């Protein structure tokens, strides 16, 4: 029999789900975008699984920074654009200057207006804003209605796989 989760457990499961959905959504978005941009499929990221950790971080930032704004689409859009734009700029810069890794470079891509050092561009920032509105207005309300024991177990299993994949491919390598 399914035991109801308490509020803390619900929040943990929801946050893990947001992280996973955002990471997978980012992988799908980039796979489609680079197929269009380059004309062939490219496996994005260094993980084995179909997820990109920077999008997981972005999704979590969007959720945490917009909890109180969840009914204000304009605030969600602006907040998500700024938060994720800064995340992408800072992470891109640090990866290049500390680890000597460049995971993205908007200098060579289509629709790269407003490009800042290849780290961010207007297209990506606008996409993050729209993604934030989609996450807060559609995804979060939908997944909060779906909670049950099977989904909770699946969330934990996928969360552990995501963490293992991240640790092996970003930290240990």
Question: What spans do the regions from the language model cover?
Answer:
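Aromatic-rich, lipid-facing transmembrane alpha helices and their immediate juxtamembrane interface loops
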Residues: 1-173
